[in-house]
A protein has these predicted regions:
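Surface-exposed beta-strand-turn/loop segments characteristic
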Residues: 1-2
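Surface-exposed loop/interface segments of Gram-negative outer-membrane beta-barrel transport/assembly proteins
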Residues: 10-98, 112-218
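Alpha-helical support elements that line or immediately flank enzyme active sites
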Residues: 99-106
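A generic beta-sheet turn/junction motif
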Residues: 107-111
Length: 218
C-alpha cells in the first residue's frame, strides 16, 4: 500500500512601496509497502504450484516452527507467497521539500514611462528516499538478511535579476534584462547490509552476524 501526505504554504508581504517579499514551499511525505520481484519474486512459488494445491489453506510453515517454510516448491532460492507476506518487508520512504523565497525592489523613478525591478530569489529542492529490503529469518531456508539503502539529493538555486522598461513613445519600447544564476547540487548514497540473524523474531540489522556499510558523497 501507499500513504502520502502533502503540505503547501505560501505568503507575500509588501514591506514598503518599493519593497516586497514572499515565499512558497511544498512538503511531501510518502511511504510505500511492496513485495519483492525478479529473482526474489513471491510469484515463483505460486506459478509452480498446481491448481489443486491450496496455497491459502495449507499452512505456509511447518507446525510449531514459523521459520521453517512449508511450500509445494522447494524454497532453496524462493520464499512461499504467504510466508513471504508474513515475514518479508520491502519499504520505500520518501521526504521532499521544494520552495523558494524572494526579495524584490521596484521603482518608477517618479515617472510614468520608466520602471525597474530588481529581484533576488533563493530556492531549494531537497529529497531523501530510504529503502528497506528485509528477508525474515527462514528466508530461502537460511537465516535472513536485510539491506538498508537510500539517496539524499539537495539542489540550491540562487538567482538575481534586474529588469528595466522604458516606454520611449507610442511606437518605441525599450526592455532590458540582466541576471546571474548559481546552482549547487549535492548527492549522497548510503547502504548498510546485514546477513544471518542470530535468532528469529527480530529482523533488524543489529541482529545480523555479518554487516557491511558504505557511503558516497558528491
Amino acid at each position: 500500500g501507499m500513504d502520502r501526505y502533502n503540505a503547501k504554504m505560501s505568503a507575500e508581504a509588501q514591506l514598503h512601496k518599493n519593497w516586497s517579499t514572499g515565499f512558497t514551499g511544498t512538503y511531501v511525505n510518502s511511504k510505500i509497502s511492496k513485495q519483492s520481484s525478479a529473482n526474489n519474486g513471491i510469484l515463483a512459488t505460486v506459478y509452480g504450484a498446481p491448481s489443486s494445491y491450496d496455497l491459502a489453506g495449507i499452512p505456509s510453515h511447518v507446525e510449531g516452527d514459523p521459520y521453517t517454510q512449508n511450500t509445494f516448491r522447494s524454497t532453496s532460492g524462493f520464499d512461499g507467497a504467504y510466508w513471504a507476506v508474513d515475514n518479508n518487508e520491502f519499504l520505500e520512504r520518501s521526504q521532499r521539500f521544494f520552495g523558494n523565497t524572494y526579495l524584490k525592489y521596484s521603482t518608477k523613478f517618479n515617472t510614468d514611462n520608466h520602471k525597474l525591478d530588481v529581484k533576488y530569489q533563493l530556492g531549494v529542492d531537497s529529497y531523501t528516499t530510504n529503502y528497506t529490503d528485509s528477508w525474515g529469518y527462514g528466508h530461502a531456508n537460511g537465516y535472513g538478511e536485510i539491506d538498508l539503502y537510500g539517496y539524499s539529493i539537495t539542489e540550491l538555486n540562487s538567482l538575481l535579476t534586474a529588469a528595466y522598461t522604458w516606454n520611449i513613445n507610442e511606437d518605441w519600447l525599450f526592455d532590458a534584462l540582466v541576471g546571474n544564476e548559481l546552482v549547487e547540487n549535492q548527492r549522497k548514497f548510503y547502504e548498510s547490509y546485514g546477513a544471518n540473524y542470530n535468532f528469529p523474531g527480530w529482523n533488524h540489522i543489529d541482529n545480523a552476524t555479518t554487516m557491511v556499510a558504505s557511503e558516497s558523497l558528491r
